[in-house]
Curated annotation (Swiss-Prot):
Superkingdom of the source species: Bacteria
Gene Ontology CC entries for this record: cytosol; small ribosomal subunit
Residue ranges, compositional bias (Basic residues): 101-127
GO biological process: translation
Alphabetical list of HAMAP family matching this protein: Ribosomal_uS13
Stored NCBIfam families: uS13_bact
One of the record's GO molecular function terms: structural constituent of ribosome
Family indicated by similarity: Belongs to the universal ribosomal protein uS13 family.
Quaternary assembly: Part of the 30S ribosomal subunit. Forms a loose heterodimer with protein S19. Forms two bridges to the 50S subunit in the 70S ribosome.
Pfam family, one: Ribosomal_S13
Region (Disordered): 92-127
Record key words, sorted: Ribonucleoprotein, Ribosomal protein, RNA-binding, rRNA-binding, tRNA-binding
Name under which the protein is recorded: Small ribosomal subunit protein uS13
């Protein structure tokens, strides 16, 4: 089993797809990496030679931010927005949509599950 950037790649998948299991690498970037290292994208992970795995590993480590480093970078960027008090930072802090989406209805994914609010009791009509 090939281990790249701390992730075990699935053995039976094509290397082009297997690389997408690494956080920060999608299909386009996977194809880019394979073109740089001259590895056939249709090769199965289990059929890769040690030299191929080493070439891919060094390409990923030297030229791309992936996994923990990328997650840390994203968290620091969001924290910076919150610290300097930008509109986007405030939206992140409040757990609301950041990019201008409506919130009167929808936005359930970002806001979470509905919490019911106890309504006022109707006062009995006095006549």
């Amino acid at each position: 089993m090939a281990r790249i950037a701390g992730v075990d790649l699935p053995r039976d998948k094509r290397i082009e797809i297997g690389l997408t299991y690494i956080y920060g690498i999608g299909l386009s970037r996977s194809q880019e990496i394979l073109a740089e290292t001259d590895v056939n994208p249709d090769t199965r992970v289990k059929d890769l030679s040690d030299a191929d795995v080493a070439a891919i590993r060094s390409e990923v480590q030297n030229n791309y931010e992936v996994e923990g480093d990328l997650r840390r970078l994203e968290a620091m960027s969001i924290k910076r927005l919150m610290d300097i008090g930008t509109y986007r930072g405030r939206r992140h802090r409040m757990g609301l949509p950041v990019r201008g989406q409506r919130t009167r209805t929808n936005a359930r994914t970002r806001r979470g599950v509905r919490r019911t609010v106890a309504g006022k009791k109707k006062a009995s009509a006095k006549k």
